Amino acid sequence: MGVTILQPYPLPEGKSGAHIIDQLSKRLLALGATHAGQFLVDCETFISTPQPHNGAPGRAVHVLHNSEYPASTFSIIDNGTGKQVAIVADNIFDLLMLKMTNTFTSKKQTKIESRGARFEYGDFVIKLGSVTMMEHFKGILIEIEYKSCVILAYCWEMIREMLQGFLGIAVNKDFPSYFAPQTIMTAMGQQQLHAKHNDIFEPMDTVKQYLEQFTNYRKHVTLMGGMGSGPGSQQVGPNVHMSPAVAGLHRS
């Protein structure tokens, strides 16, 4: 695998998610991309029970699956204070969580997934995801992988140009938020700024990006004014600048 980036796509007023994904699919095919099956990434969150009574944050276990790795279950344990522990296990981990009902309870109302078509274009793999939570449409999430590189710092500009050329939106020159420099504690107990964009990319990095985006979608507020939560609803999304090219796509 190579470096993978997630990019939310703005859904214009009056257009359904299905319509926009259809238009993006046609654009990819016109560029010479080939359809290469379907994909699915899902996330279910379990909350510790009982919840602390002293106001302290409770623990959460996020369980994710990625169709690119069908034999694996990805788990991210959050202690509620910002510290996370990531685990990769086989699918028996799902059965384990079902047997821990006295300790963790599933928040089924927030179960969320991104699914859709998968395309291959040269060294790129592009996935057009329709994000739904409890069968309610939440937005469009684009996944793009550059297979020929495993360190973002070496290929970000190429990925960025591909995103802008295909999507027609302005993509920030800065590295995505997931790759922002982080403060870590060294073995000597000293704080040090760590440049994550120089790390070798791993499958868990893709999963963590999905959790980041899914968390954002869970927080989204549906715009008022006759826009329900069905497939054609308009959702509050990230601030993304649209070029004239993509504006024309929206009007089609």
From Swiss-Prot:
An annotated GO BP: positive regulation of DNA-templated transcription
One of the record's GO cellular component terms: mediator complex
Record key words, sorted: Activator, Nucleus, Transcription, Transcription regulation
Keyword Transcription regulation in record: yes
InterPro entries registered for this protein in UniProt: Mediator_Med20
Localization per Swiss-Prot or TrEMBL: Nucleus
Domain of life: Eukaryota
Pfam families per UniProt: Med20
Single annotated GO MF: transcription coregulator activity
Keyword Kinase attributed: no
Family the entry assigns: Belongs to the Mediator complex subunit 20 family.
Function: Component of the Mediator complex, a coactivator involved in the regulated transcription of nearly all RNA polymerase II-dependent genes. Mediator functions as a bridge to convey information from gene-specific regulatory proteins to the basal RNA polymerase II transcription machinery. Mediator is recruited to promoters by direct interactions with regulatory proteins and serves as a scaffold for the assembly of a functional preinitiation complex with RNA polymerase II and the general transcription factors. Required for activated transcription of the MtnA gene.
Subunit composition and interactions: Component of the Mediator complex, which includes at least CDK8, MED4, MED6, MED11, MED14, MED17, MED18, MED20, MED21, MED22, MED27, MED28, MED30 and MED31.
Protein name: Mediator of RNA polymerase II transcription subunit 20
Organism annotation: Drosophila melanogaster
